[in-house]
Amino acid sequence: MSAIYNFCAGPAMLPAAVMKKAQQELLDWNGQGVSVMEISHRSKEFIALTEQAESDLRELMQIPANYHVLFMHGGGRGQFSAVVNNFLGEQGKALYLVSGQWSSAALVEAQKLAGEAQIDSLNIVEKHNGLNAVVLPDLHKIDADYRYVHYCPNETVDGIEIFDELDSPWPIVADLSSTIMSREIDVSRYGLIYAGAQKNIGPSGLSIVIVRDDMLKLPSLPQSSIMDYRLAVEHDSMFNTPPTFAWYLAAEVFAWLRSTGGISSIAKINQQKAQMLYQCIDGNAFYRNGVVAANRSQMNVTFQLVNEALDSEFLKQAQIAGLVALKGHRIVGGMRASLYNAMPLDGVIALVKFMNEFAAKHS
């Protein structure tokens, strides 16, 4: 069977080695005679798995000791709510930087839940010669006392990425759902990081939260117990039954990433993959991209065919060639190739070859 390369934005492809290992031990995990899906989350065997997963993630991301690592329910949207309820209190203020669809969605959720609290926002994307560009404000010039500033460094729908780390006088809350572990960051600059698992961590249903200890002292609002960071810390992410199979697969992904050389190594490959695809787009008048070079996403490469009437044929022929899930988000249309950590370089080589051949045939 020919290779199939899955460019889905999420749930995304998992490393082949992880999938094969999960397949091999699906019915008998760790010599238990049963699946990892069937054992108690409080058993010593599963606790050992969770401890190793956290240890591996801490090593990969160089997470300081004054940060808690939580494995939670709810995905990214669940954390939109949890951030507000855990940190804003009844009279707090927060600032949301809007760079695309997901940061906008976080803002809408915050406004819905804030009550008497104040939610401010800044649109940080402008048009430069018809292309989307991020313009980061000087936050130190803003006279306000915010509990936190929220932003999303990578917008999967819009194909926009912010590579410069934010400089803020207030704690930074970041949605890293689509960039976590794709490149190195300084965790100590953040008050809280959250990430839905279904892009660079594992399957959907799990979210990772990395929260600095002092953030847990901020006033909170009444909320669901399973989204209470303080309870999650107190109960080692097991206030209720966690998504155990997703946790297991996340642990395997962390181990796989360590075995491949860690984040510094995968970051070089990710950069190479993105550069290769953007060079194809820029080098062919058949395709176009709407983002300035400095803010083009490495994880989610969006592009359009100049002749949009060929979109359906492009997707049909790509599917036949084993290149799946290339259709752009319904809001923006066009095409999108998601190049998360699990996407091998060979997948991008195959996509570029197909794009060049398709353009030559239909130009």
From Swiss-Prot:
UniProt-listed InterPro entries: Aminotrans_V_dom, Aminotrans_V_PyrdxlP_BS, Pser_aminoTfrase, PyrdxlP-dep_Trfase, PyrdxlP-dep_Trfase_major, PyrdxlP-dep_Trfase_small
UniProt-annotated binding residues for L-glutamate: 42
GO cellular component, one term: cytoplasm
EC nos: 2.6.1.52
SUPFAM superfamilies assigned to the protein according to its UniProt record, in alphabetical order: PLP-dependent transferases (SSF53383)
Alphabetic keyword roster: Amino-acid biosynthesis, Aminotransferase, Cytoplasm, Pyridoxal phosphate, Pyridoxine biosynthesis, Serine biosynthesis, Transferase
Record text on cofactor binding: Binds 1 pyridoxal phosphate per subunit.
One Gene Ontology term from the biological process aspect of the record: pyridoxine biosynthetic process
Record's subcellular location: Cytoplasm
Reactions listed under catalytic activity: O-phospho-L-serine + 2-oxoglutarate = 3-phosphooxypyruvate + L-glutamate; 4-(phosphooxy)-L-threonine + 2-oxoglutarate = (R)-3-hydroxy-2-oxo-4-phosphooxybutanoate + L-glutamate
GO molecular function: O-phospho-L-serine:2-oxoglutarate aminotransferase activity; pyridoxal phosphate binding
Cofactor needs: pyridoxal 5'-phosphate
Amino acids binding pyridoxal 5'-phosphate: 76-77, 102, 156, 175, 198, 240-241
Sequence positions bearing N6-(pyridoxal phosphate)lysine: 199
HAMAP family referenced in this protein's UniProt entry, alphabetically: SerC_aminotrans_5
Family that this chain belongs to: Belongs to the class-V pyridoxal-phosphate-dependent aminotransferase family. SerC subfamily.
Assembly description: Homodimer.
Protein purpose: Catalyzes the reversible conversion of 3-phosphohydroxypyruvate to phosphoserine and of 3-hydroxy-2-oxo-4-phosphonooxybutanoate to phosphohydroxythreonine.
Identification of the protein by name: Phosphoserine aminotransferase
Species the sequence originates in: Shewanella baltica (strain OS223)
